[in-house]
């Protein structure tokens, strides 16, 4: 056996041992990488699906006019945050996991951390402001409709994103404000405050625990309000005829232009004139007055007792409705004290029923309706003017109440969608923030695989959100089918 010049058997054996050690060291680093390949493939698929689904949501909102609503602006904000998580945060996290070390340098590390914290926080805040919007829409439907504009919603969304971007300050400039408590660990991508307990606890409370508790409180109130409204409607539907039945009775009724032996206490101004003695004289007209039960009111007193009171109505030729005069006279004959006793303000909540549906009456509505009741009856042309004003106010009131009812139906479906979004949000993020608090107080309790699992469980929320929209929203479902060319 020959040797190379200058190479002794001892030195050759030492070289072979060193080469063997180097190969074994290489195998020790590549073997875990190969074992992680199936996991890397799965996580890469999750990232691609997250990007595709959130792009689909954004395109659906942009292309479908039915989705151009104020409420969907919050969905767009949530989808943008989830898109950043899927397109930027997930791929860099997969590379970090695959190599078991950060190899992209400190600048890209800070960029990745910034995008991770900002997008995740923006996603949480988007769910929070969406919850507030649903809460106000259900609790204050008429009042909030005037306030609920795209401009105000956009300003709220902008504020949520600006608050989320505040994370950039401690991530990039912690060492400028606070003295570092420890040296950065080699081949690790982590913030300068990773071992600062008080800061981590404070941010966890502000970013997750406080918004989550508020969202749960809001959603409980939403659930109770929707449930109460549904119970009111069931009560009304079981006790009152529908508007179509009333209309059928009206068409079959025999209408006389003059009451049999009675003079109508409230004449149509076009059918009345006033003579010198101040007596109303009927005038010929093609319009007729008939008694018609047009609506009923469901009231709830302070003790929680629910009762109904019928509201007799008058239908006037072209279909306008107003309260019958006998009801008006009973109100006008009340003294000042009894009027105060029976005023609308004494009832905490009232619901009016049209076509079998119950709608809340707001203070503005009731004050408008009660206006003509508070004064004394007038005669002649003044009573005709009062009649026109009262009819117009009743029409406006019923229009607002009907709009409120339609809005309430939409908000009931939106509350269901919000419930699914909140459930996915809490289930995905609470393990991470619980473990986040544990390692903040017990640094020896840190477990890298568990920590990585909780992080990716939070990322998975960005994948689930766009799946929830079509499941809980018919317009999203139809739009998705149209875009993907799926037959209905």
UniProtKB/Swiss-Prot annotation:
The keyword Cell membrane applies. The modification Phosphoserine is found at residues 239, 345, 381, 383, 397, 399. PROSITE patterns: G_PROTEIN_RECEP_F1_1 (PS00237), G_PROTEIN_RECEP_F1_2 (PS50262). This is Histamine H1 receptor. Residues 116-121, 425-429 are annotated as: Important for agonist binding. It is a multi-pass membrane protein. It comes from the Eukaryota. It comes from Cavia porcellus. Belongs to the G-protein coupled receptor 1 family. Histamine activates the receptor by forming hydrogen bonds with transmembrane domains 3 and 6, squashing the ligand-binding pocket on the extracellular side and opening the cavity for G-protein engagement on the intracellular side. Gene3D superfamilies: Rhodopsin 7-helix transmembrane proteins. Residues 259-274 have a biased composition (Basic and acidic residues). Residues 259-285 are annotated as: Disordered. It is found in: Cell membrane. The keyword Phosphoprotein applies. The gene is HRH1. Disulfide bonds join 109-189, 442-445. Histamine binds at residues 116, 121, 207, 432. The modification Phosphothreonine is found at residues 149, 151. The chain crosses the membrane at residues 39-59, 74-98, 107-132, 154-173, 198-220, 418-441, 448-470. G-protein-coupled receptor for histamine, a biogenic amine that functions as an immune modulator and a neurotransmitter. Through the H1 receptor, histamine mediates the contraction of smooth muscles and increases capillary permeability due to contraction of terminal venules. Also mediates neurotransmission in the central nervous system and thereby regulates circadian rhythms, emotional and locomotor activities as well as cognitive functions. Residues 60-73, 133-153, 221-417, 471-488 are cytoplasmic. InterPro entries: GPCR_Rhodpsn, GPCR_Rhodpsn_7TM, Histamine_H1_rcpt. Phosphorylation at sites in the second and third cytoplasmic loops independently contribute to agonist-induced receptor down-regulation. One of its GO terms (biological process) is chemical synaptic transmission. One of its GO terms (molecular function) is histamine receptor activity. One of its GO terms (cellular component) is plasma membrane.
């Amino acid at each position: 056996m020959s040797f190379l010049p200058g190479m002794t058997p001892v030195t050759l054996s030492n070289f072979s041992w060193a080469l063997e050690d180097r190969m074994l060291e290489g195998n020790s680093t590549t073997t875990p990488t190969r074992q992680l390949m199936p996991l890397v493939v799965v996580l890469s698929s999750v990232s691609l699906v997250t990007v595709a689904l959130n792009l689909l949501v954004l395109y659906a909102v942009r292309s479908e006019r039915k989705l151009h609503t104020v409420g969907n602006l919050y969905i767009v904000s949530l989808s943008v945050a989830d898109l950043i998580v899927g397109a930027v945060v997930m791929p860099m996290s997969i590379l970090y996991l695959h190599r078991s070390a950060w190899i992209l340098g400190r600048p890209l590390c800070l960029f990745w951390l910034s995008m991770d914290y900002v997008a995740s926080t923006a996603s949480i805040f988007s769910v929070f402001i969406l919850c507030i919007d649903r809460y106000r829409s259900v609790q204050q439907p008429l009042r909030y409709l005037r306030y609920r504009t795209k401009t105000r919603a956009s300003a709220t969304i902008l504020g949520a994103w600006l608050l989320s971007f505040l994370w950039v300050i401690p991530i990039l400039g912690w060492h400028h404000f606070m003295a570092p408590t420890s040296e950065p660990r080699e081949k690790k991508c982590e913030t300068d405050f990773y071992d600062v307990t008080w800061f981590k606890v404070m941010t966890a409370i502000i970013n997750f625990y406080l918004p989550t508790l508020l969202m749960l409180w809001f959603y409980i109130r939403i659930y109770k309000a929707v449930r109460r409204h549904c119970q009111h409607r069931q009560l009304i539907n079981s006790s009152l005829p529908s508007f179509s039945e009333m209309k059928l009775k009206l068409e079959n009724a025999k209408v006389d232009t003059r009451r049999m032996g009675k003079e109508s206490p409230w004449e149509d101004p076009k059918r009345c004139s006033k003579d010198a003695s101040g007596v109303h004289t009927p005038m010929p007209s093609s319009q007729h007055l008939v008694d018609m039960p047009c609506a009923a009111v469901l009231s709830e007193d302070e003790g929680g007792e629910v009762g109904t009171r019928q509201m007799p109505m008058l239908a006037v030729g072209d279909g306008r409705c107003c309260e019958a005069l006998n009801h008006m006279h009973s109100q006008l004959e009340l003294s000042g004290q009894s009027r105060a006793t029976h005023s609308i303000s004494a009832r905490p909540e009232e619901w009016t029923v049209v076509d079998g549906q119950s709608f809340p009456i707001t203070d503005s509505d009731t004050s408008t309706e009660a206006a003509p009741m508070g004064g004394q009856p007038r005669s002649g042309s003044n009573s005709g003017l009062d009649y026109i004003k009262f009819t117009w106010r009743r029409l406006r009131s019923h229009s607002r109440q009907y709009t409120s009812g339609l809005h309430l139906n939409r908000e009931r479906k939106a509350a269901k969608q919000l419930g699914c979004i909140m459930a996915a949000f809490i289930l995905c993020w609470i393990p991470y923030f619980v473990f986040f608090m544990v390692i903040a107080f017990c640094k020896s309790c840190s477990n890298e695989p568990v920590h990585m699992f909780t992080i990716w469980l939070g990322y998975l929320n960005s994948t689930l959100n766009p799946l929830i929209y079509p499941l809980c929203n018919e317009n999203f479902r139809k739009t998705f089918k149209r875009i993907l060319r799926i037959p209905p």
